Amino acid sequence: MKKYILLPAMMVAAMLSTTAVKAQEDVNPLLKYVNKENDLKASIGGRMFADVAYYHTEWTPMKSGAAITDARIHASLTYGKLFIYADFGFGNGEFSQKNLFAQYTFKESLKGIHLVKAGYYNEPSSMSMMTSSYNYHFISRPSVSQALDPGRSLGATYKFFNRHFFADQGIFSQLKYNEQEEGYQGFSLSGRWLWKPINDNNITLQFGTGLRYQRINGGEVYQDGVYKTNMHVAANMQTYVDETTKFLSCDLPWAKDAFTISPEFLFKSDRVFARGEFIWKKVWKDRDDQTLFESQLGGQQSWTNVEGWRSGNKLRPTIMNGGYVEFGYLLCGKAYTYDDEYGLLKGMGDKGGLELVARYSCTNLTDITDGDIFLIGNHKFYPNGKVVDYPYSSSIDGGTMHSVTLGLNYSFNQYIKIMGEY
């Protein structure tokens, strides 16, 4: 069983960007081309994040040090109502595909704006994961969002928004390169819906929720042609210098369907913001019991009927949850601003901007069956308080973490920012 740990950490992140961030994509860089006659705009930009961290605890073997945690090159093209964006990362010395999509705004009126989007980008079901890392007011996102919310996927969405309402929903594939070992891809349906009873130049009050259904199909051949699916759930310790997930991680074999709900709130004034989410995920499992039962017949200790085999190899749903609340106070600089197109708080990028931030987050990846015991020597659970070979325990222990973060952020200008956290 994973132990509770204490992790005092001092972290500093420096951000350099050739971009003045507009909305949640980088679309107003220094290097750009504008052709007003043909309503054409093109741009190229980039950014780099460098982190330094010192971890002090006797219980947690993590590596203090420094790292280039993110480096990106991006390009965008706007032609009339069509917007195309590509973003590629080189953080930690590795190439990675970030955002790559096309977006078309097909109707604008006083009642609202309608648009469609297709490509590879964040699924719209989480306030935290939808916020660009440059616009985030902390060095890292909370662990619960990393573990239970989706990141980027290949798909298509339809969005509508105005001053008081926001709706963003779509369908996505399980894997962007169809790289499952066997079987065909699964899919997910994701959406985020918001109501803003107050939304003016000074104050925004927002309530909403994200919903996601996921179907997992592709997997590996287990035995006798049976596909075994798996869901890996993991998060780092809210730091990028050492991104180990060994303290918060679990595998859910035979995962088939998953449902996630993420209610959220946001309050923003000129000098203060508060926001938070609660995330609840349930994972249902499925396997071909009949085939697996038949494959063990004839053994020296084989089960004689499928009901007995099921009782010795129990399968039940797994529930995981967590949440976070974040607060910020702007000591110097212009007012906090809000982005209607994404339903998100914008980042601090004014010259001389200084803010104080705080966050509490909890992540629970543990779902233990009542009565189960954990034997440290074997590193496994046993049901009903008895150390026996059968039945197997269906308990999951991916770890539980509570975290408190205090931060101070300073913006030299819209291109350079330094962030410190404890």
Question: What annotation goes with each model-predicted range?
Answer:
Residues T18-A23:
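Sec/Tat signal peptide C-region and signal peptidase I cleavage site
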Residues M129-S132, G219-D224, D289, D370-G371:
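Short aromatic-enriched loop/helix-cap "lid" or pocket-rim segments at secondary-structure transitions
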Residues W59-T60, K228, H232-Y422:
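Outer-membrane beta-barrel pore domains
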Residues P8-M15:
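Bacterial N-terminal signal peptides
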Residues M1-P8:
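Bacterial N-terminal signal peptides that target proteins for export
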Residues Q24-N28, V34, L189-S190, I216-L252:
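Surface-exposed, low-hydrophobicity segments enriched in Gly/Pro/acidic/Ser residues
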Residues L31-H56, T60-N201, L205-N217, I319-M320, ...:
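Outer membrane beta-barrel
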